[in-house]
C-alpha cells in the first residue's frame, strides 16, 4: 500500500452544486428558486407564512391572559442552601432571608421574593424566612431542627390592605 493509493470512500465528498451556470446544468436561469416574486429574491423567509393556507397561529384559538399582578418568586432548593453553608458563605446560626441569599451568591436576585423547594439534603439547622415553601422543603428543614417562616408578600401603596 502506498500513500498514493489512499482515497476517500465513494460519496464521502460530494461536490457542491454550482447554480446559475446555464440550462444544461439543470440548475441554470432561476437556480432552483422557481419563477419571479418575493421568494426568488435573496434573504426572504416570511415567518409563519404557509403558502396561503390559514397559518397555525390564526387557526388556533386565543387562550389565557397575562396577570399583571402576579408575583414572580425566585426558587431555591435545599441543596443550594447547604452548599452555601458548607462553603461558609451563609451562616446557619443567623436568620436566612432573601437578602442574605443574594449577598452569599446563592441567588442572583430576589425579584418579588423567594420560594423554598425540597431538592437535596439539608444537614444544617437553619431558620429561614421565605415567601413560599413546598411541603417537602418545610418537612426537611424541621427534620434538621430548623424553622421556616412564611412571609406575606409586600403590598403596593395603591392596593387595599
Curated annotation (Swiss-Prot):
Residues 21-37 have a biased composition (Gly residues). GO terms for molecular function: rRNA binding; structural constituent of ribosome. Pfam families: Ribosomal_L27A (PF00828). Keywords: Ribonucleoprotein, Ribosomal protein, RNA-binding, rRNA-binding. One of its GO terms (cellular component) is cytosolic large ribosomal subunit. Residues 1-43 are annotated as: Disordered. GO terms for biological process: translation. Binds to the 23S rRNA. This is Large ribosomal subunit protein uL15. It comes from Bradyrhizobium sp. (strain ORS 278). The lineage of its organism: Bacteria, Pseudomonadati, Pseudomonadota, Alphaproteobacteria, Hyphomicrobiales.
Amino acid at each position: 500500500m502506498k500513500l498514493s493509493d489512499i482515497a476517500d470512500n465513494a460519496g464521502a465528498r460530494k461536490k457542491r452544486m454550482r447554480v446559475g451556470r446555464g440550462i444544461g446544468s439543470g440548475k441554470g436561469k432561476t437556480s432552483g428558486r422557481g419563477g419571479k416574486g418575493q421568494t426568488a429574491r435573496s434573504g426572504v423567509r416570511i415567518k409563519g407564512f404557509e403558502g396561503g393556507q390559514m397559518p397555525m397561529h390564526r387557526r388556533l384559538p386565543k387562550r389565557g391572559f397575562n396577570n399583571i399582578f402576579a408575583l414572580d418568586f425566585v426558587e431555591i432548593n435545599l441543596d443550594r442552601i447547604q452548599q452555601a453553608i458548607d462553603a461558609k458563605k451563609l451562616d446557619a446560626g443567623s436568620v436566612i432571608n432573601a437578602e442574605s441569599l443574594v449577598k452569599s451568591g446563592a441567588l442572583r436576585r430576589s425579584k418579588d421574593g423567594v420560594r423554598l423547594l425540597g431538592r437535596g439534603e439539608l444537614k444544617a439547622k437553619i431558620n429561614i424566612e421565605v415567601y413560599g415553601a413546598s411541603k417537602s422543603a418545610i418537612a426537611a428543614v424541621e427534620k434538621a431542627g430548623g424553622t421556616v417562616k412564611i412571609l406575606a408578600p409586600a403590598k403596593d401603596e395603591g392596593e387595599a390592605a
